Amino acid sequence: MSEFKGCPMGHGAAPQNGDGGDSGDTGNGWHGAQMDFARDMSYGDYLGLDQILSAQHPLSPDHNEMLFIVQHQTTELWMKLMLHELRAARDGVKSDQLQPAFKMLARVSRIMDQLVQAWNVLATMTPPEYSAMRPYLGASSGFQSYQYREIEFILGNKNAAMLRPHAHRPEHLELVETALHTPSMYDEAIRLMARRGFQIDPEVVERDWTQPTQYNASVEAAWLEVYRNPSAHWELYELGEKFVDLEDAFRQWRFRHVTTVERVIGFKRGTGGTEGVSYLRRMLDVVLFPELWKLRTDL
């Protein structure tokens, strides 16, 4: 019988001693684990942890500012992954490669679920605690997140006015401008349906990509045909449901944002100059994929 080696990643290795206890230090490593990384890449090296964990620089003396910084930095990391997945999924839809796109869209929805839960951590910050650090934030606001703006644009909520907060950083402005001028995920899905023979109005298939998604009757008619006969159009049916899953998760993320902000600052104006909760509530009315929601009434 061959000797048990355990998981190739080093987990679950066979005990080094006869009784299977915890005293597995043989002098060469703990249960066979490599202990010397003077010449090899370690966990921290691979993840760049020195850079990540030294990127928190509170400006106030308040204990709770670290929570505020870590909350928003981790959100930006998750949004980086969302953009990675959304761009690839959009490319998949554009090239008629829907199966890989389904996995990517499902992953984005789960990331949004993660971000919904993250608001529960920030909600542990009370109004007095936030008030103690708020003066140190200046005019900085999540409203200015260029990654969030890219996500909005990729999902079809275009607004050229939202370029202005990024004008002072040309490298960020270029990314947001590119997202503004590129067909959204939903635009590519509609063009895919047209390529597959559905009767879509030409002005929708080739439109001004800088404008937000608007309801169109021919698009709803196409989706209705898909939903009335899913077995004949299974890929498009699954794509439609992936979009609905994604928007549902996005709405929950937005809603939890509203309730957390109201809990912490009430109806004060946001640090970025917006109306705070009132502005965020209006954003809840944005519909990314209008035909996919309306058809549920019309089926």
UniProtKB/Swiss-Prot annotation:
One Gene Ontology term of the biological-process aspect is: L-tryptophan catabolic process to acetyl-CoA
Where is there biased composition of kind Gly residues? Answer: 18-30
Q: What is the effect of changing residue 271 to A?
A: Abolishes catalytic activity
Write down the chemical reaction(s) this protein catalyses. L-tryptophan + O2 = N-formyl-L-kynurenine
Hey, which family's this protein in? Belongs to the tryptophan 2,3-dioxygenase family.
The UniProt subunit note reads as follows: Homotetramer.
What's the protein name? Tryptophan 2,3-dioxygenase
